[in-house]
A protein has these predicted regions:
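Bacterial N-terminal signal peptides
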Residues: 11-21
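Bacterial N-terminal signal peptides that target proteins for export
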Residues: 2-10
Length: 208
């Protein structure tokens, strides 16, 4: 009897060990891509998946909090930051489906009428295979070089730096835009939903 009990104990122990080992290999797509940047280095959290206290909704997109992100798939609209920024670095985690038409707009000139003509639009638009509008491009400013990157159906990261007239965009740690332009000096930031499914999970900003 003791031998049987001991065998059962060993089997259970081995099962638990395998289970715990497997938990340490959670796919990165299911976790936050970035570790939270240090406040000591000047980083500020604009969105952490829990509330939209630092944003104002414009338009009729059906923004809602769900499963640690904010997402929309109906209507067209923006989430606009309540503060304006001049020189900064911003990190954004996003997920888009194949139909998504979205983007991150910076240095808005008019937060009530947001377009790529009165701000810088860093695009999220796999569906339009045009170097001027593809994912990774700055619309009207910097075309995306082929092969064009695709963001659909996975978590991605944008890291955007605006310092003076220098604009740099990194998509999943790859530079997709590095250009000088002085049209817009400062303004709020906006997250767009204009078709398809778009989700934003984390947004951090560091004034420079």
């Amino acid at each position: 009897m003791k031998s049987v009990s001991k065998s059962i104990f060993v089997v259970i122990a081995l099962f638990l060990a395998v289970l715990l080992q497997g938990c340490s290999y959670i796919p990165k797509s299911l976790t936050s891509w970035y570790d939270a940047p240090s406040k000591d280095e000047g980083w500020v959290t604009l969105f952490d998946g829990n509330n939209l206290n630092q944003w104002t909704a414009i338009g009729n997109a059906n923004w809602r909090l769900y499963d640690g992100s904010v997402q929309a798939e109906i209507g067209s609209g923006f989430l606009v930051s309540k503060k304006s920024y001049k020189d900064f670095q911003i990190k954004v985690e996003f997920w888009a489906d194949e139909e998504a038409n979205s983007g991150i707009f910076i240095r808005l000139s008019d937060s009530k009428n947001i377009t790529a003509d009165n701000s810088y639009e860093v695009n999220i638009f796999d569906k339009r295979p045009d170097p001027s509008y593809g994912t990774g491009a700055i619309v009207n400013i910097s075309k995306i070089a082929p092969p064009m990157p695709l963001a659909a159906n996975k978590w991605n990261t944008y890291e955007i730096t605006a310092k003076g007239d220098q604009l740099t965009v990194m998509l999943n740690d790859v530079v997709t835009a590095d250009v000088k332009d002085a049209k817009f000096a400062s303004g709020p930031i906006a997250l767009q939903s204009a078709g398809g499914v778009i989700k934003f999970r984390r947004v951090w900003i560091k004034p420079l």
